[in-house]
C-alpha cells in the first residue's frame, strides 16, 4: 500500500530524463538529532503543561478523566498518539487482539575508531537471509565525520525475547562479512528495542480501526499518528 505504481512509460521516460519527486528528493537531518523536532515543539508550549515520567493507567470515557500513576486529569478533548491497541486497553474498548499485529526492531548505534569502507551511502538495505540485519545507516556520511558511526536494525516477531548482547556479537560478525568493517575497533555502542516498530496492516484491522476510532470520537478521544492511526508512514 506504500509503494507507488510502476508505470512502464514513466520508467522508460526516466531513463532519458531522470527526475525524482518522492519524499527522498530532499533529505535533511538536525545536527542535534531527531530530538530537535521535539525540542522545537517544546519551546512553543507552556512548559508547566508538559508532564514527563508520568504513565497513563486508564481512561474513564464517561467521566472524561485520564488516570495516571500520579493523578487524575479532567479533559474536554483527548488526543493520543500511543499505539492504538494500548489506547483501546486503557479506554476499555473491546477488540479482537488477533487482527492487530506488529514486529519489534532491535536498533544498535555503533561508533568505531576510524572511517568505514563506504563513504557515499546514507543507508543501505540487506534483503539476504545470511545477514542478521535488514538495514544499516551511516551517521558519519550524513555529518561528514572522519570516524564510522552506524545504526543497525534487526527485525523480530513481537513475542520474541531479545538479548541485545547476544546480537551485538552477531552484528559485528555480519558487518565484517558484508565488507562494512574490517579491522575496525568498536569504541562505543548503545541499543534500543522499538516495540511496536512496524505495524502489520490487513483488511480486518483497517475495517476494525474505523469502528474503534468512531467509538473513541464519541467520547472526544482522537487517536492520531503512525501508531495511533495504526498505519505505515514515514516522517
At which residue positions do the language-model features occur?
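Active-site/ligand-binding neighborhood in enzyme catalytic cores
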Residues: 1-62
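Active-site rim elements
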Residues: 25-28, 159-160, 231
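Short, well-ordered alpha-helical scaffold segment located
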Residues: 44, 83-86, 229
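Surface-exposed helix-capping loop/turn segments at secondary-structure junctions
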Residues: 47-50, 75, 177-187
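General small-molecule cofactor/ligand-binding pocket signal
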Residues: 51-53, 187-190, 222
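Mid-domain catalytic core of redox enzymes
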Residues: 54-179, 206-216
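C-terminal catalytic lobe of FAD-dependent flavoproteins
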Residues: 180-181, 191-235
Amino acid at each position: 500500500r506504500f509503494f507507488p505504481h510502476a508505470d512502464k512509460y514513466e520508467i522508460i521516460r526516466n531513463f532519458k530524463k531522470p527526475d525524482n519527486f518522492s519524499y527522498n528528493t530532499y533529505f535533511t537531518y538536525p545536527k542535534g538529532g531527531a530530538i530537535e523536532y521535539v525540542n522545537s515543539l517544546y519551546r512553543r508550549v507552556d512548559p508547566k503543561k508538559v508532564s514527563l515520567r508520568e504513565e497513563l493507567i486508564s481512561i474513564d470515557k464517561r467521566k472524561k478523566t485520564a488516570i495516571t500513576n500520579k493523578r487524575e486529569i479532567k479533559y474536554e478533548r483527548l488526543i493520543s498518539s500511543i499505539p492504538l491497541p494500548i489506547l483501546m486497553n486503557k479506554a476499555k474498548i473491546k477488540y479482537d487482539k488477533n487482527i492487530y499485529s506488529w514486529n519489534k526492531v532491535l536498533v544498535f548505534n555503533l561508533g568505531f575508531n576510524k572511517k568505514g569502507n563506504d563513504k557515499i551511502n546514507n543507508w543501505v538495505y540487506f534483503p539476504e537471509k545470511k545477514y542478521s540485519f535488514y538495514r544499516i545507516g551511516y551517521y558519519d556520511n550524513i555529518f561528514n565525520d572522519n570516524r564510522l558511526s552506524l545504526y543497525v536494525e534487526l527485525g523480530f516477531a513481537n513475542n520474541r525475547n531479545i538479548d541485545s548482547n547476544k546480537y551485538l556479537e552477531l552484528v559485528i560478525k555480519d558487518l565484517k562479512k558484508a565488507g562494512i568493517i574490517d579491522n575496525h575497533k568498536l569504541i562505543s555502542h548503545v541499543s534500543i528495542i522499538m516495540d511496536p516498530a512496524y505495524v502489520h496492516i490487513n483488511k480486518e484491522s483497517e475495517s476494525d480501526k474505523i469502528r474503534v476510532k468512531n467509538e473513541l470520537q464519541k467520547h472526544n478521544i482522537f487517536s492520531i499518528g503512525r501508531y495511533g492511526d495504526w498505519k505505515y508512514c514515514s516522517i
